[in-house]
Every structure is written in C-alpha cells, then in structure tokens.
C-alpha cells in the first residue's frame, strides 16, 4: 500500500509536468503522447528530490517528499487521479483510504530471504613435481583388477577404509580397454595404508589384485606405460616384487629413462644435501631402520617421498640411490640392465630414498645441492662432519622436500646434476660411509658392501683446495655420523652385527615386503638390475655388481631388498683389505645405520646383484630374464681387482660414481664413493670430473637411465678405463693427512652441487676429508656376513626350484602342444577318411598326405622355445619372459572348410588349426622347416617348407602371422606355399612392415639362431623371435593390445576368408597336411605373417638355407615353379641384401636363377634349387633367418606398403619377381614384340605384389586364393605367371597406373582387387574381377584380373595360381611379364619359374600365359604390364589390406590394378637379365628408366604420362583383355572343378562410345567413381613429373559427385542391391512393410553377402553373439583365454552357483530401452551375487558354425551363442532361459564368468554392484575388436560406441 521513497526513486520522473496534483484527463493524453502513450510511473509516483516535481517551474509549495498515484483514471474509468503524499496525505482530502502507518520496503521480501549457496570449490592441495617434502602416501595404486571393476565398485570397496578424494580407473587411450589399473587417493594416510593392508593380494571379482601405496603414482604410470607398450597384459603385468624381475628391459629402461635418472640425480643430490639428515640426526641404524621401516610404510617413494623418513635418510634405497646417483654414468651402462631393473628403481625413487637418507648428505656433492640452499652451513659443517649432519639433519625433512625441490632446482642442470649426482652419489655413499667413520664401529659387512661396492677405492682427483676443509679427519667427525654414542652403538660389533642382521632380516622381511611393494623381490632389484655376471661368481661380485648396479633397489624395497645382502655383498665383494678397510672405515662410521644403509644401499645395489641373485644365478635368469641384463658394470667391477686394503674399496656402489681413481682423468667416474663419507663427497665431485670425456658426452643419455644403471655404466666405464686409475691413499694414510685432493677431491656440499652442475671438478670440500685408506676411528674390519652362505644357498635352491618349475611347465606346455598337434593330425585324418566318401579326394589331397608323411616329425626340442636359448637362459626362455615365450595350446578348433565349389583340388575341408596351435605348429613347423628345409613334398607340390619366418612380427604381425599361419596352415602344403605366399603377400604388407620393425630383433635372434643348425635356427629364431615377439605375442596372445587383436583377428579373418576362398583342394590338402602343414604351414604361416621385406637373414644361416634350397628336389621344383621362385627368393634372401639399387647379382649370393626368361625346364631346374619366391617376392617370404637382414632403407618402400621393396639393379631378378605369388605369365622369350612383353624394369625391384587386396578379406574365400591354390599346382609350374605381391603395397598395381585398378579413379579398377569382389562369394578369377567401369573399357579391364588357371584341371587342382588374383593375374598372360603381376614392372620371372606344364595344353610357351591361352593374333593384345599404382591412400597400411570390406566395394584402400597395354605404357628399361625383353619396351616416355630408386619408392612414378592416354588405350587393351579373359576364363572354367559362370564379356566400345562416355559428364555429371579415377590420374601425373607445367598450377579441389543417377539412368534394383525403392520415394511416408528375409540378411549381424558357396570357415564368427563373419579367431581365442584364466579361481563362484540353485533371483524380461528385449531384476540383488546362469544347448564349434549360418538364413539376426571355451559354445537361440535377453552395456551391472560345476562348464552372470528392482541387468559382451563395428546402444556415460 504505502510506497515510500524507495519506490519513488524508481519512479522518479525526470520531467514531471505537475507537482503531483491530479492531472486532468487531457493531460493524461498529453502525457501519453509525450511518453509514447506510456504512463510514466514518474508521473504517477514521484519523489521530491529537492527540485520541483513539475516542469512548469511552479513554486513548490508542498512539504512532502514523495507521492504515489493511488487511483489512476487510466485504469479506473471516471475517476480522478488520487495521489498520496508521503504515505499520509491524499490529493483528495476526503479520500477514504487510511494513511500508511508503517513504512516498509515494498519489494517482495521472499526474494531476499532466499539465498543461493555459493559453493566455491576449495582447491585440493595438489602435490606436483614442485612439491618439496615427503609426499604423504595417500595415493594407492591398484593393479591386476578385473576389467569389470569400475569406479563405483572401486569406490565402494575403498570407502570403508576412509574418505576418498579421487578414484580413477585407467583405460587404454587407444581402444578404451580396461587396463586393470586404478588410482585411489584417500583423504588420510591411514586410510590408504589400511586399504593397502586389507586389499592387497585379495581376490576381487576373481582376480588377485595388487594394491600398493604409490604416493606420486610413479608405479602406476610405469604399469600404465608397460601395458600401453604392449609389453605386458593386465594379468601378466609385473607388480610389486615381481616388478623387479619382470620389468622388461625396454619398458623399464623407458620408464627409468623417462627422466628419472636425471631427476634422481637432481633429487638425490639436492636431497642428499638438504634433505639427508646427518646420520647423527638419527643413529645411522635408526636411519637405515627408519628407512627400512619407511620403506615398509610406503612401498616406495620412488621419487616421491612416501612417508617422511624419520631419519631423513630416504631409504636404504637412498643408499642404493646414492649408488644409483653415485654413478649415473655407470648407470648408463646399467641402462641396458636397467631394462632389467624394475622401474621401481627409478631414479626418482632412488633419489628420494637417497635424499631422505641422512647418510646421503655425507655422500653427496649433490647433497651440496640441497646444501646449495644451505651450502654455507653445510660447508661449514662439512669440515666438522657432525655439523654437516646437523645441517643435513635439518635438511632431512627437506630431504624429501629438498629432493624434490632440489630436484626441480636441479632439473635444468640435469646433466650437470647428473654429474653432481654422480658426485653426490658417491658422496651419498660416502655419507653413509662417513657415518660409519663417525664411529669406527666394526663395519658391518652388510652395510660395508654397499659402500664397498666400489671394490677399487676411488681416488678422486685431488679436489680443489676445498678438499682441505674436509681434510678434517672424517673419523673424528664423520659428517653426519650419528652421535658418537650412536656410533658407538653402531660401532659396537654386537650392535652393528645386530643392526646388520636386523636390516638383513628386516630387509629380508621388511625389505622384501618393501621390495615386493616396490614390486620387486628382494633380490629382484639386484637380479633385475643385473644378473650377477658369471665373473662375479661370489657375493663380492654381486657386491661389485651392487656397486655398479646403477639402480639401487627401489627406494623402499629395492633399496636394499636384503640389508644383510648388502653386507654379504660387501663382504664377499670386497673383503679385500681395501674393501674391508673401506668397509670398516665406512662401515664403522656407518655403524649399523650405515650398515643398514649399506644394506639398503647394497641391497639396493646388492639387491641388484643381490645375494639373492647369486653371481652365478642371474635371478634365475628367469626372474629378470629379459629384464635382467647382466651388469657389465658388475662384470667390470668383478674383474676389477679389489683395491689394496689401504685404498678405499670401490665403495661406490652401483649407485656410487666410481671414484676418480678409475677415471681420474675422466671426470666420468667422479670417484668411487669411498666408504669414508669425506672421501665420498670428493668422489662425487670427482665423479663427473672423472667421468671419461665420452662418458660425459653421454651423460645426458646416462641421465636418462636409472641411477643404478647410470652408476653401473659409469663405474663400468670408469673401471674398465682405469680400474684403479686414481691412486689410493695409503691405507695407513691419515684421513686428515690425506687431503681430499689426494684420494678424493673434497666435496663442499654447498659448492658441490653447483660445481657439479657446472662441471667444476671439485666443489669446495664441505665435508671433512677422510683418508679413504685410513679406517675411521673405531673401525673394525667387517666380517663376512654369517648369513651370506645361507642366503646364497637359499637363493640357489630357489633358483634351482624356479628353473625346475619353469622347465616342468615348459615341458608340459610342449607336451600339450605336441598332443594338440597329434590330436589335430588324428582329427584331420579322421575327417579326411570320413569325408573321403563324401567328397572326392583330389590328387592334391594325396599329395598332402604324402607331404604329411614326408614331413619329419618335429622333435620336442624343436618345440621348446628355449631349444635355442640356453636352458632358461636369458636369451632362450627367461623367467622374465615367463610363459610369454611359450605359446599356450590354442583352444581354437581347427575347422575344416567345406570344399569350395571353385576349388579344384582337395575337397577335404580343412579344419583351421587353432591360431595358437597353429602358432605352435608354425613355430615347430618353422623349426622343422628349417631342419627339413630340404625336404620337399613328395607330391611335388611346392615344397611345404616355406622359409621358416622367425616370429618377428610385433604383436600385430605375430598375430597376423599366427592367423595367417593358422589359416594358411589349413591350406594344403603346396597350396600352402602359394597360399602362404599369398597370405604372406597379404600379411606381407602388414607383416613386412612389422617384420621390418621386428626384423632387427628377429634378425638378431635369427642371426643367432642362424649360426646354429637350421633346426636350432628355426627353433631359436622362433624361440628368440618368439621370445622377442612372443613376449609380446604371448602377452599379446590373448591379451595383446586390442589393435593386435584386431589385426590378428582381421588377419585371421582374412585368412579364414582366404582359406574359404582358397580352393577346396587347398582345404583338402590342408586338412591332410593340416597337421603337417600346420607345422609347416604354421612355420610358413608364421613366416607368412612375418613377411616384411625381409632383411637378409643372418648370413650365417644362408649357407644352410642355400643348402636346404638346393636340397629341394629339382623335380619337385619343376612341379612347383612357385617353389622354385620361392627358392630363388630364398636364395636371394639368403644372399646378403644388395646395396640399394645394386643388382641382385652384386649380392654376394648369386641367384642361379637370374634367368631372364628361361623357357626351358633346365632353367626351371636351376630355379628349382632355389626356394620358390615368396609371394611377396621379397625376402619376406624367405625365412627371416636365411634372409640377409636388409635394411628397409635398402629398398624403396612400395607406395602401397611401408614394407621396403628391395631395389635390385637389373642384374637381380626383382624379389618381387622371385616371388611368383601372382602367377603372371612371362612373355615367352620368343615373343616377337619385346615391347609387347614388357618386362618390368629390373629397376622395379621387387615391389612384391600384395598377396591380397582388402576386398579379399571381405570375401570368405578369395577366389584368387583358390586360384592361388590351384595355381600352386599350376602356378608352381607357372611361377613366373604369378605376380609377386609387393610386400609393402596393399595390392599390386598393374597396368598403367592410370588405368591400374589400384587407382581408385581408374576406370579399370577392379572393385575388388582380390578375386573376391563380393565379400561372401568366392568367384572364379575372371568373375572376381569386377571393375567399376569409369570408362567404357573398364569392363575389359576386368579380364585382366582373372587368375590364370592352368589348362589342365590337374594343375588347377594341384595349385591355385595365386591366392589373390593379382593384377590381371588371370589373363595376364597378356601381360608380357610377370611384370604384369608385379606391382612394378619387374624383370619377368624366369620362365623357369613357370613350369611349362603349368601352361595350358594349348601349350603356348610357358613364358606367358598369353601364349598358354591360344588367342587369335588380334587377341594377343599388346602385353600389358601391371604397374602397381599406389592409391592415394596407397600408404594405407597393412591394415588396409586387412580391412574387411565385406562388400567387395573398392575402397580407396583397395589398390586397384589396371592392365595397360605395354605399348601404352612408356617403355620401361628391361632388366638385363631378361634379354628377351627389350629394355626399351619398358622405358618411360621420357626415356628414363621407368623407375628410379626414388621412383621405385614411389610406385606411382612408374606410370608415365601414359595415364593420359590410358583412358583411350584401355579400350583396346580391355578388348584384348576381355578376349584373353574369355580364353582364360574358358580354360579356367573348363579346368576348374566347379566352374563359376563365365563372366560375361562385352565388346569393346568404339572410340565414339568412349568419347561419348568421356564427355557424358557434361550431360549427366560425374559420378564418384569417375572422380576417383580422375583424382588418381591427377595424382599419378603429378608424380610423373613429365613437365606438365599446367599440372603444377592445377590444384585438385574436391567436388561432390554431380551424377546422382538420372531418371533414365536409374537402373533396376536387383535383389542384391538392397532394400527396394520406396514407392513414394520417402521411407517416412511408406509406413511399414515386410522386408524380404534376403534383404534382411545383408543387415544381419553377419553382414556377409550370400555367396555361391557359403563361408565354410565361420570359425571366428560371432560365437559370443558376435554377428560378424569377421569375428577374429584371435581375439576370440584371447577372450577365451581370459575367461578361462579368470575362471581358475571360481570356488566362491561355485558356492554362489550352488546357492542359486536353492534360491533363484526373481527376474523378468520385457522391452528394454537398450535394445529389444532386456532382462530386469524383480528383486534387489546385492553385489557379487549370482544372478542367472546362461542356459542353452552345449554345442561344438562345428555345429555352432552350421547353426550360425542357418540362423542367418532364417533371418534370426541376433546371435545367442555364448562361447564357453575353445570347443564348447552355449546356444540359447532356440532353447535357453532369460539370460539370453541380457543386453550389453559399456557400464554393466553384471559380469559373466565361466565356472566349472561337476566337470561341466557353465556361464554364470554375477552382479557387479547392487541392482535395484526393475533395473535392467546388463553385462559387457566383450566382443573382440573388429573393423565392422556393431553400434552400442547402451547409452552409458562411458559408452564405447560399439560392441566390438
């Protein structure tokens, strides 16, 4: 009511017209007008602001201050305005309203009573790298978690221990895979510790989880890196104690090198200075003990202070650290080992530990860094060590802090720091030692060893004058030595022994625990660090190792896994008087604490060498296996004589820089830290100075290494350079008398850091100098650790046991493998016998059987991966490798594929061997093959023995290898070769790259193996490469990264497809030879997968290979031209790689087969001696071992593939040629027109033609592959016909690049290079070629692709020409040379390669298929050369090849090959080798060789301007091709057992028609295909550099296709075209109508096109409800294995299962928002309860495959098949329970588990979390990753988007 001033303020009008008296109505109107017909509130209500309200200027007579319009005539008709002034007076005196008595704010109070809580998040205190101080151990790292564990579950699990700040589960960034690692940050340290204590090693969801305190997440990061690198899988990830042994050298090295070394150095130095409290602060013992306890408290402060070390001593680790720091450079040497060392030894850790250690302060020059902050005091204190300790003590807390701060401070100067660190490290040790000097207590052997490690007393270069300061007898005031009392305690022999033992025991216990926490067993560190070199058979050696070992044990655990060990080490190590003396000096001062430190340190270092690791036993080599690298440093140290007693022992432990004495002139070894603290500082200074110049130059690298590694490196280097370069002060020398300048330059803690950083040789001595030779007061000679013998004995026993266990396990594995193989063989035989009646057995089958018989049985030894490796030696089978090297028996069922109608030979359906089995078989067969290299299939089919290819592939390659091997193993042996070739080709792209990558490894292993016998070589290579790759493989085998899985699966899938496509005979023979083949095939397969441009195998093996090759029967070779070519290839491969561009001839090994195009069998025979060229035509095919390692650089890379293509000069047959993988007819030498037969210029070295195009993958069976199989029979004869697959290229390009199908845009591109156009349907070679006719000729082009089939069906049956019809493979007879087949024109394969018999009966000279197919002269078109043209995406890697284009659509990825008449092609130089072919014919228009090396690298360049003309030329070419194709197809159809309908041939278009089509774009626009061709042509022309200036000025701008199909152009939809057109043209207006089941089939989960012959091999198909044909067997296998592994601990599950029987959960199914039907809980379900069993029919794989097809045919789109294991599948499609309705979710509330109940495996669904009523039950299907993605509809926040 009453509106007071406030309102008036709002309403105050600027120009009141009246004072506020009522306005007359007229005024109102005026006001309205004035104010825009807006009643101004100011008019109605106002306030007198000391100025008249009215503008009239009337005198204000009123006394009111405000007014309000009570009645407004505008609102109330007929009234006058009534105002109220000041709430009391009204303008109308007798107005009936009462005045306002209470004045209040008219605004609505509710608006103000409401308030929003401003919740400003309080930033959490974040501990980053700049944090100074011990990082509170509130962060817990979980490892080995079940992949069903999600944040919510983890939070619930941890919150009971205390409040949680953060929970994070780590996923693989690439594929979002659960890594089994998680981080939980608690609010309090207590909660974190409780969580670790209660959760560590407990079973969660069936997994024994690893839980550890990880304050800075370093361990977690390390685990993460290892998992990401593929080194480990979540289940094999080494954690805790395992870590030390298990860390792979690479991952560890990477982790260590990540910066930790430098950081450690920094941290170590600084922390030592600032952070280390004088040992005096705490009794050294207590410090050490604290260290150990601290270590126990916190797994490790690997670079992060975990729990403040009370002593300020970081950990005994710190000592280790010091040792680590001590000689970063040495560590560099260690670096190798560091790989072996667990990352826990990271510098950071060590540094932290080190820094924390009070002793460090003594030791460090680095401390000086810390001191830098307080350098003066430290210096001051230094002379009086105790003060220094005080200083140090103060720092100790900072130690952690300092260590970080210092670290950060010193980070920039890392290299210097490093130096400093080196100094520091020695100093640290020295500090430790110094402590002992405080009291001369008898040095405990334990601690002494650590410091003593430097057997040779480092004699630092005389430090600058500052030395003198330290000159103060250290003994008198051991720097930080604990107070004399403490010292005395320590010094007292009993107390010290007790201390030593305690640390020893503790270390054994605590240390172990700590170590385990760190993730490495006690000895692990040492063992990890380095297996004890044999030189150091004794502990002392380990001590030396210790000294050297760059990485001390983890701060906490690694530091000194065994305190006693340190002493033992020290004792054994250097009980030399010098050592003893140093030890005693050091040890005494150190006393127990030092001992402990020493122990720790030594344990860090010792641990590295660790008593545990007997010098003789490198941690069972298994522990560290790969990880362990023998410490050269140790070896050096071992070799290094112990310094004379007078001299300080080489106290520098691994962590300590060698005293300058070793490298006085080299700063590198600053100086072994003397045991005397004083000396150590000097050493630390000296370290950098002493490090050899080269070492200094390499410091940055060293810095990257773990400290221990650095230390070892430096010490090794220093020692090796001058073991005792620096003079040792006379033992008698007075410490005071001995200036630091003498033995050790004085270190001024303060100055040291700076100096070190700046490279000053010696900072001012901040620490008292002690004569290293003079024992500190109270020094008592250290006594050997009484427990050393016991420890050694125990270790030895343990190692023996481990070895025995490993051997037993491995033998069992091998036996299982053999048993599996035997079973497979038996199965194959049974299947063959059973099917013999059903399907005619082709001759090939018999051959296969013969081959099988011929195949020598593999010996068990061949199966043993360590067959080559020394027992369980590092190389052979390391424990580190664990079982990784061993292939688990594969669970995959080998299914025989039903004979393809097209397959001409064996009808037997091959049961694809399980990938794993195949891999095993492959390995074995590889070995066998190597051993039996000479053995040839009696049948005369191409020798089964493919060059065994070492398993070099990376996980991807391996898997591919495995898969291809597996799948291919299915192929008959002879088929196998071609198939292998093809698969090799296929995989060669990928594999080539992988091989190239891995080659170095595998070659190294190969070379090693090559030395040994073939068998050994094969086994060793397989075992080694196996261990190389198998490490990745095995780890990756089932869990390999999803990429691998994908690739492998893809590969397998592809292979499966290939197998399907392969002729049935391949299958048949495969089945018969599957066992033999599986072995040989697997070999081959492995090899095949491995193929990458082979770098030559080690020459050593070459002789064997050659011998083997020669051993091959010539007759056989005759039968197997492909083999001959393979042999050639092998020979070539055997030959050392020729220099780039050098002709093969130049290679050391001459290929007998340089045959230009020999027509005669003799040449064939010659070739026969050679291995058949691998399909890739590159060494890839040949055994890696035999293959000389050819640097990839040697060959330009095929544009399509990264695989290098060997550039061979004319003299050599391009490797591609050697590999007749594509059987292209060579032009008969007699061919009159050489040009017509354009041999690919030899310059086109081997661009191996890809074995298969991506489309092949799409097709279950590549018809081409079938042909390949037949061709094998034929092609072996016609090896020349086969076109080598360019290892690097996805597909071979043929024809003018312009027209080459590779060119996407090329009118002649065959939609699917691979014969298989439609993914599902095997096609006859001719049919396979479908080209998108961009140009009228395109139709003709298709003819070019068909694979030549031999005239004789026998031949066809025997061998498909090639796995994939390569470029115009079939009628390519037209191609003058195999050039047609080779992606690049290459010298034609010697006719010898082509068995004349292979030629069709028409008997044209085998030289060319053209000839083989009689054709009218006009029919003989100008020979066409298939020039591989890199697609734009040519670079598309192997993956492209593997990409599954189910639809046979040409993907840009698919290279398309077009055949161009040779005439159209610019002449390419012909190889001299092919005299028949005029080199002219192959010359570019420019006259330049078609390919220069550069050009070779760029396939595209090969095609000259021809592109421009190619469009036109293509027509005639196409005509001839068509005709030829007609012939060929006719022949093929005649010979093929099941002739697929001939591809219709069309008359070539006239020029007018061609032009009409060309210019039709103006009428109808241009379609996508033409755009693609144009783009390809454009790109090719750009690459040709034919002086088309206009091209350079032309920029390709993408434009959408304009030809969307005209009304007239609308073609009738065929049924297969897809869903019918909507009558109304719009689906929305159509409503619903029934879709034909056939139409639906396309969209069913298996989007497999209906093929004339259904895919026989559905092995990988959607078993776990996986819809796709492409389901990879590999990933299936891995997922199976994961399930099986997880089902091992299922006792509790059984209990739950049994409980379920009594009380089933109430659940119902109803419509789900996720997809169709879903399962919902009708009652609350608690976490981890059994929800339901997945019930269905238990069926075998074969039945599952059949049913899957049937279900697809019936239109059942969903798959309810759930795989239980490799041979059992539960099919709930038609009978089952509600479980089948459970939908997938990326954030499921349940998980599936396989449990065994009464010997029956059951799939049970368990709840992961509490499930509420009406909540849908979901679990993660965990489909293997595939290319064809199934969209995920779960809608979860973290939805992956796809099921697979």
Curated annotation (Swiss-Prot):
Gene Ontology process terms (BP): hematopoietic progenitor cell differentiation; methylation
Q: Which InterPro entries match?
A: COMPASS_Set1_N-SET, Nucleotide-bd_a/b_plait_sf, Post-SET_dom, RBD_domain_sf, RRM_dom, Set1-like, Set1B_RRM, SET_dom
Q: Where is the composition biased (Polar residues)?
A: 39-48, 273-288, 295-305, 313-336, 368-380, 400-411, 1277-1300, 1369-1381, 1659-1673
Q: Can the keyword tRNA processing be found in this entry's annotation?
A: no
The record's section on SUPFAM superfamilies has:
RNA-binding domain, RBD, SET domain
Q: Which family is this sequence assigned to? A: Belongs to the class V-like SAM-binding methyltransferase superfamily.
Q: What is this protein called?
A: Histone-lysine N-methyltransferase SETD1B-A
This chain's source organism reads: Danio rerio (Zebrafish)
């Amino acid at each position: 009511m009453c509106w007071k001033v406030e309102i008036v303020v709002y309403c105050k009008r600027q120009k009141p017209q009246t004072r506020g008296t009522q306005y007359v109505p007229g005024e109102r109107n005026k006001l309205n007008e004035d104010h825009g017909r807006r009643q101004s509130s100011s008019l109605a209500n106002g306030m007198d602001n000391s100025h008249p309200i009215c503008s009239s200027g009337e005198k204000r007579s009123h006394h009111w201050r405000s007014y309000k319009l009570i009645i407004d005539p505008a609102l109330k008709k007929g009234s006058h305005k009534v105002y109220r002034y000041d709430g009391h007076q009204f303008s109308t005196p007798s107005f009936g309203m009462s005045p306002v008595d209470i004045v209040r704010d008219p605004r609505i109070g509710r608006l103000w009573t409401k308030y929003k809580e401003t919740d400003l998040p309080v930033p959490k205190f974040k501990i980053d790298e700049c944090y100074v101080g011990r990082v509170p151990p509130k962060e817990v790292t979980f490892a080995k978690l079940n992949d069903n564990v999600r944040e919510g579950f983890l939070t619930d699990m941890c919150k009971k221990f205390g409040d949680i700040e953060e929970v994070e589960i780590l996923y693989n960034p690439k594929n979002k895979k659960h890594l089994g690692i998680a981080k939980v940050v608690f609010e309090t340290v207590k909660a974190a510790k409780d969580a670790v204590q209660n959760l560590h090693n407990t079973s969660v969801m069936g997994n024994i989880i690893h839980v550890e305190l990880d304050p800075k997440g370093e361990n977690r990061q390390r685990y993460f890196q290892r998992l990401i690198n593929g080194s480990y899988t979540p289940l094999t990830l080494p954690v805790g104690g395992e870590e030390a042994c298990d860390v792979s050298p690479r991952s560890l090295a990477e982790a260590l090198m990540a910066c930790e070394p430098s950081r450690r150095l920094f941290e170590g130095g600084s922390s030592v200075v600032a952070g280390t409290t004088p040992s005096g602060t705490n009794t050294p013992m207590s410090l050490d003990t604290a260290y150990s306890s601290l270590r126990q408290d916190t797994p490790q402060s690997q670079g992060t202070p975990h729990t403040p070390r009370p002593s300020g001593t970081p950990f005994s680790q710190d000592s280790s650290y010091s040792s680590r720091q001590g000689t970063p450079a040495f560590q560099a040497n260690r670096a190798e080992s560091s790989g072996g060392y667990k990352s826990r030894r990271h510098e950071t850790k060590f540094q932290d530990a080190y820094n924390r250690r009070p002793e460090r302060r003594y030791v460090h020059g680095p401390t000086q860094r810390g001191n830098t902050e307080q350098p003066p005091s430290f210096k001051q204190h230094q002379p009086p060590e105790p003060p220094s300790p005080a200083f140090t003590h103060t720092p100790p807390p900072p130690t952690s802090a300092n260590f970080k701060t210092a670290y950060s401070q010193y980070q920039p100067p890392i290299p210097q720091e490093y130096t400093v660190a080196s100094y520091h490290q020695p100093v640290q040790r020295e500090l430790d030692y110094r402590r002992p000097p405080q009291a001369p207590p008898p040095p405990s052997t334990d601690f002494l060893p650590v410091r003593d490690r430097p057997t040779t007393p480092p004699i630092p270069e005389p430090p600058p004058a500052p030395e003198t300061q330290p000159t103060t007898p250290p003994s008198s005031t051991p720097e930080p030595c604990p107070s004399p009392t403490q010292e005395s305690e320590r010094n007292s022999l009993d107390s010290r022994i007790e201390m030593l033992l305690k640390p020893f025991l503790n270390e054994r216990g605590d240390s172990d625990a700590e170590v385990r926490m760190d993730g490495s067993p006690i000895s692990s560190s040492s063992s990890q660090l380095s297996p004890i070199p044999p030189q150091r058979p004794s502990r002392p050696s380990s001590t030396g190792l210790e000294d050297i070992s760059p990485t001390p044990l983890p701060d906490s655990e690694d530091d000194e896994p065994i305190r006693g060990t340190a002493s033992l080490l020290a004792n054994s190590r250097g009980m030399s008087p010098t050592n003893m003396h140093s030890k005693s000096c050091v040890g005494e001062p150190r006393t127990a604490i030092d001992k402990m430190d020493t122990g720790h340190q030594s344990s860090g270092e010792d641990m590295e060498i660790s008593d545990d690791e007997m010098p003789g036993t490198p941690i069972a080599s298994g522990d560290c296996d790969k990880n362990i690298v023998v410490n050269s440093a140790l070896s050096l140290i071992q070799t290094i004589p112990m310094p004379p007693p007078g001299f300080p022992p080489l106290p520098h432990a691994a962590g300590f820089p060698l005293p300058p004495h070793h490298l006085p002139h080299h700063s590198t070894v600053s100086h072994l830290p003397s045991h005397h603290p004083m000396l150590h500082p000097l050493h630390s200074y000296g370290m950098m100075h002493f490090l050899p110049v080269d070492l200094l130059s390499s410091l940055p690298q060293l810095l990257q290494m773990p400290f221990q590694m650095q230390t070892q490196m430096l010490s090794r280097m220093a020692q090796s350079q001058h073991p005792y370069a620096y003079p040792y002060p006379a033992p008698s020398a007075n410490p005071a008398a001995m200036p630091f300048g003498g033995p050790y330059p004085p270190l001024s803690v303060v100055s040291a850091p700076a100096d070190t950083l700046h490279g000053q040789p010696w900072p001012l001595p901040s620490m008292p100098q002690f004569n290293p030779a003079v024992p500190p007061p109270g020094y008592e000679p250290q006594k050997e650790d009484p427990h050393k013998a016991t420890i050694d004995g125990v270790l030895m026993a343990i190692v023996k046991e481990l070895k025995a266990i490993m051997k037993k396990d491995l033998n069992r594995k091998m036996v299982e493998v053999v048993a599996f193989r035997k079973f497979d063989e038996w199965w194959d035989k049974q299947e063959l016998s059973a099917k013999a009646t059903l399907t005619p057995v082709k001759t090939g089958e018999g051959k296969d059987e013969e081959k099988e018989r011929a195949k020598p049985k593999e010996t068990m030894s061949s199966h043993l991966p360590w067959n080559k490796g020394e027992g369980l030696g590092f190389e052979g089978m390391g424990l580190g490798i664990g079982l990784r090297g061993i292939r688990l028996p594969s669970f995959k069922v080998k299914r025989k594929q039903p004979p393809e109608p097209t397959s001409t030979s064996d009808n037997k359906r091959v049961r694809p061997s399980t990938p794993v089995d195949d891999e095993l078989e492959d390995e074995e067969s590889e070995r066998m093959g190597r051993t039996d290299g000479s053995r040839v299939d009696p049948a005369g089919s191409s020798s089964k023995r493919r060059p065994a290819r070492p398993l070099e592939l990376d996980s991807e390659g391996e898997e591919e290898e495995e898969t291809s091997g597996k799948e291919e193993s299915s192929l008959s042996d002879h088929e196998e070769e071609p198939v292998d070739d093809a698969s090799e080709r296929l995989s060669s792209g990928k594999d080539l790259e992988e091989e190239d990558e891995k080659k170095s490894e595998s070659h190294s292993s190969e070379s090693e193996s090559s030395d040994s016998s073939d068998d050994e070589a094969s086994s060793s290579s397989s075992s080694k490469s196996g261990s190389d790759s198998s490490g990745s493989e095995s780890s990756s085998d089932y869990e390999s990264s999803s990429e691998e899985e994908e690739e492998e699966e893809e590969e397998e899938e592809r292979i499966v497809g290939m197998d399907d496509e392969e002729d049935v005979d391949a299958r048949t023979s495969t089945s018969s030879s599957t066992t033999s083949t599986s072995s040989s095939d697997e070999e081959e397969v492995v090899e095949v997968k491995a193929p990458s441009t082979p770098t030559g195998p080690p020459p050593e093996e070459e002789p064997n290979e050659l011998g083997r090759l020669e051993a091959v029967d010539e007759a056989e070779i005759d039968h197997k031209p492909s083999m001959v070519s393979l042999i050639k290839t092998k020979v070539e491969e055997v030959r050392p790689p020729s220099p780039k561009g050098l002709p093969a001839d130049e290679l050391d090994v001459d290929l007998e087969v340089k045959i230009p195009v020999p027509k005669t069998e003799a040449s064939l025979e010659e070739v026969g001696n050679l291995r058949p060229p691998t399909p890739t035509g590159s060494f890839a095919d040949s055994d890696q071992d035999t293959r000389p390692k050819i640097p990839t650089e040697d060959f330009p890379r095929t544009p399509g593939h990264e695989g290098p293509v060997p550039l061979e000069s004319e003299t050599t047959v391009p490797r591609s040629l050697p590999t007749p993988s594509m059987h292209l007819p060579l032009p008969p030498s007699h061919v009159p027109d050489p040009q017509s037969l354009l041999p690919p210029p030899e310059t086109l070295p081997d661009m191996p033609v890809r074995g298969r195009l991506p489309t092949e993958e799409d097709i279950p069976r590549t018809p081409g592959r079938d042909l390949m199989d037949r061709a094998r029979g034929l092609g072996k004869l016609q090896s020349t016909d086969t076109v080598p697959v360019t290892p690097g290229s996805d597909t071979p390009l043929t024809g003018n690049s312009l027209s080459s199908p590779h060119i996407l845009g090329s009118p002649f591109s065959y939609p699917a290079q691979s014969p298989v156009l439609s993914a599902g349907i095997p096609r006859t070679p001719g049919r396979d070629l479908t080209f998108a006719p961009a140009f009228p000729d395109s139709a003709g082009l298709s003819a070019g692709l068909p694979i030549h089939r031999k005239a004789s069906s026998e031949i066809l049956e025997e061998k498909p020409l090639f796995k994939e019809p390569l470029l115009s493979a079939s009628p390519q007879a037209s191609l003058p040379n195999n050039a047609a087949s080779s992606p690049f024109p290459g010298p034609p394969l010697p006719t010898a390669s082509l068995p004349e018999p292979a030629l069709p009966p028409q008997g044209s000279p085998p030289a060319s298929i053209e000839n083989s197919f009689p054709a009218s002269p006009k029919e003989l078109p100008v020979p066409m050369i298939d020039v591989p043209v890199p697609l734009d995406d040519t670079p598309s890697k192997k993956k492209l090849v593997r990409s599954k284009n189910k639809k046979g659509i040409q993907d840009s990825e698919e290279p398309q090959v077009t055949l161009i008449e040779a005439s159209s092609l610019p002449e390419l130089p012909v190889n001299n080798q092919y005299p028949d072919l005029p080199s002219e014919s192959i010359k570019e228009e420019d006259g330049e060789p078609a390919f220069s090396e550069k050009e070779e690298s760029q396939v595209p360049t090969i095609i000259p301007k021809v592109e421009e003309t190619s469009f036109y030329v293509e027509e005639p070419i196409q005509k001839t091709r068509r005709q030829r194709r007609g012939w060929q197809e006719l022949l093929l159809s005649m010979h093929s057992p099941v002739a697929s309908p001939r591809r219709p041939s069309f008359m070539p278009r006239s020029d007018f028609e061609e032009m009409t089509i060309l210019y039709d774009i103006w009428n109808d626009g241009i379609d996508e295909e033409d755009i693609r061709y144009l783009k390809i042509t454009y790109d090719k022309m750009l690459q040709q550099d034919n002086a088309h200036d206009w091209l350079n000025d032309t920029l390709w701008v993408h434009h959408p296709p304009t030809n969307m199909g005209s009304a007239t152009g609308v073609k009738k939809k065929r049924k297969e075209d897809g869903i019918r057109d909507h009558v109304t043209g719009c689906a929305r207006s159509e409503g619903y109508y029934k879709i034909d089941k056939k139409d639906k089939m396309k969209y069913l989960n298996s989007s497999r096109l209906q093929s004339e012959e259904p895919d026989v091999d559905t092995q990988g198909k959607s078993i776990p409800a996986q819809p796709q044909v492409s389901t990879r067997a590999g990933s299936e296998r891995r997922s199976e294995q994961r399930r099986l592994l997880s089902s091992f601990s299922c006792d509790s599950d059984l209990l739950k299962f049994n409980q379920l029987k009594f009380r089933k959960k109430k659940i119902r199914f109803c419509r789900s928002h996720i997809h169709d039907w879903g399962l919902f809980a009708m009652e609350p379900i608690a976490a981890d309860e059994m929800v339901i069993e997945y019930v269905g029919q238990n069926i075998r794989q074969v039945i599952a495959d059949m049913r899957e097809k049937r279900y697809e045919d019936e239109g059942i789109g969903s798959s309810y098949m759930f795989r239980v294991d490799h041979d059992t599948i539960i099919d709930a499609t038609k009978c089952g329970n509600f479980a089948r309705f459970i939908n997938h979710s990326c954030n499921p509330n349940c998980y599936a588990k396989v449990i065994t109940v009464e010997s029956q495996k059951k799939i049970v669904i368990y709840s992961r979390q509490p499930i509420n009523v009406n909540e849908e039950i979901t679990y993660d299907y965990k489909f293997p990753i595939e290319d064809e993605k199934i969209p995920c509809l779960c809608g979860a926040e973290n939805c992956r988007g796809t099921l697979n």
